Curated annotation (Swiss-Prot):
GO terms for cellular component: cytoplasm; extracellular region. Secretory calcium-dependent phospholipase A2 that primarily targets extracellular phospholipids. Hydrolyzes the ester bond of the fatty acyl group attached at sn-2 position of phospholipids (phospholipase A2 activity), releasing various unsaturated fatty acids including oleoate, linoleoate, arachidonate, docosahexaenoate and lysophosphatidylethanolamines in preference to lysophosphatidylcholines. Belongs to the phospholipase A2 family. SUPFAM superfamilies: Phospholipase A2, PLA2. Disruption phenotype: Mutant mice show abnormal hair follicle ultrastructure characterized by defects in the companion layer, the inner root sheath (IRS) and hair shaft. Mutant IRS cells have large cytoplasmic cysts and pyknotic nuclei and are devoid of keratohyalin granules, whereas the cuticle is abnormally dissociated from the hair cortex and medulla, indicative of impaired hair follicle development. Mutant mice are protected from obesity and hyperlipidemia in response to high-fat diet. It is found in: Secreted; Cytoplasm. Disulfide bonds join 44-135, 46-62, 61-115, 67-142, 68-108, 77-101, 95-106. The gene is Pla2g2e. Its cofactor is Ca(2+). The keyword Secreted applies. This is Group IIE secretory phospholipase A2. Binds 2 Ca(2+) ions per subunit. It catalyses: a 1,2-diacyl-sn-glycero-3-phosphoethanolamine + H2O = a 1-acyl-sn-glycero-3-phosphoethanolamine + a fatty acid + H(+); 1-hexadecanoyl-2-(9Z-octadecenoyl)-sn-glycero-3-phosphoethanolamine + H2O = 1-hexadecanoyl-sn-glycero-3-phosphoethanolamine + (9Z)-octadecenoate + H(+); 1-hexadecanoyl-2-(9Z,12Z-octadecadienoyl)-sn-glycero-3-phosphoethanolamine + H2O = 1-hexadecanoyl-sn-glycero-3-phosphoethanolamine + (9Z,12Z)-octadecadienoate + H(+); 1-hexadecanoyl-2-(5Z,8Z,11Z,14Z-eicosatetraenoyl)-sn-glycero-3-phosphoethanolamine + H2O = 1-hexadecanoyl-sn-glycero-3-phosphoethanolamine + (5Z,8Z,11Z,14Z)-eicosatetraenoate + H(+). It holds the Pfam family Phospholip_A2_1.
Length: 142
């Protein structure tokens, strides 16, 4: 009996390194073709923290990612430090992990990476390294 394709893909897992930021970065780069650092400090939500109204759809992806991490923190997870397992095909990301926190963190990162890919046309260099003082408007709820 042949193993399911998802199991075969898990044999090609990305190595684990220092929290999940490296893992998230790999997802972003593979899904968008852009260096992950281009999403750090983008708009009002990509990077550490976030407030006010997102500047575009790419920034909304980061807002949703922040909300996802916030929900996990309320459940007792530490998503910024969770190391998880994942594999990537051309069009999708498959998550795995020993714990629910690992799997859910991977799912948060997966949704954000796929959101970035879906909204590549909204990425605007003028929002890269965007000063937080330029962020305006109310902070949308999760």
């Amino acid at each position: 009996m042949k193993p399911p394709i998802a199991l075969a893909c898990l044999c090609l897992l990305v190595p684990l390194a220092g929290g999940n930021l490296v893992q998230f970065g790999v997802m972003i780069e593979r899904m968008t073709g852009k260096p992950a650092l281009q999403y750090n400090d983008y708009g009002c939500y990509c990077g550490v923290g976030g407030s006010h109204w997102p500047v575009d759809e790419t920034d909304w992806c980061c807002h949703a990612h922040d909300c996802c991490y916030g929900r996990l923190e309320k459940l007792g997870c530490d998503p910024k430090l969770e190391k998880y397992l994942f594999s990537i095909t051309r069009d999708n990301i498959f998550c795995a992990g020993r714990t629910a926190c690992q799997r859910h963190t991977c799912e948060c990162d997966k949704r954000a990476a796929l959101c970035f890919r879906h909204n590549l046309n909204t990425y605007n260099r003028k929002y890269a390294h965007y000063p937080n003082k330029l962020c305006t408007g109310p902070t949308p709820p999760c």
